[in-house]
Amino acid sequence: MDTQNTPVHIKLWHRDFWRLCFANLLLMSSVYMLIAAIPYFLILEKYQLWQIGCVLLSYGLGLFLFGGFCSYLVQRYRRNMVCQLSILGVVVCLSVLYYLDTFWNIKFSFEVLLAVRFLLGAFLGLAQMSLASTLVIDSCESFQRTEANYITSWFARFSVAVGPLVACFVYIYFGMEYVFPTASVLALGAFVLVSRAKFPFKAPAEGIKVFSL
């Protein structure tokens, strides 16, 4: 078994690093696809502009929910499992409202929409922290970490363009109602890529506080 100090990859651009970079791209693109989709559907449901703004804002606030607990979670539990479960949380948040509304005709209140968007932001924030700050770092050697962080951040920036472009393509050729399922598929793709990546063994640190800034 590899230890924490065992050199695993000499080159940065190895298979697992590619998987993590594209997982980051798919995950962030799935969320950026909703930039146009959420206002579109909320306007159809006759929501007021301030309500639409609050729904969008709740996502941003949710990003910070697990920030103080991330260090404890990745040390207490397997770091790749923390990331994978967080991504599954994103998938559930992307899917639940769409499928219940489309197939079961269940309408949700404004408060429930706020809660789901808040949870979406919370799960995405934890997935991003565990992916970009932990898994990517652990997949490369110490002298490559600055370059790895730089590359990963550019994949995330690229998703700002990819997400809305994919949403526009889906809207033009299939309809806006397919944007949410497509976003869920992209997030599932990120889950598969992370689950396929391999990481060296890392002993958990001792004395980690449950909450830390």
Name every feature range the model reports, one short phrase each.
Residues 2-14, 199-213:
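Juxtamembrane intracellular "pre-TM" segments in multi-pass secondary transporters
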Residues 88-107:
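C-terminal ends and interior cores of transmembrane alpha-helices
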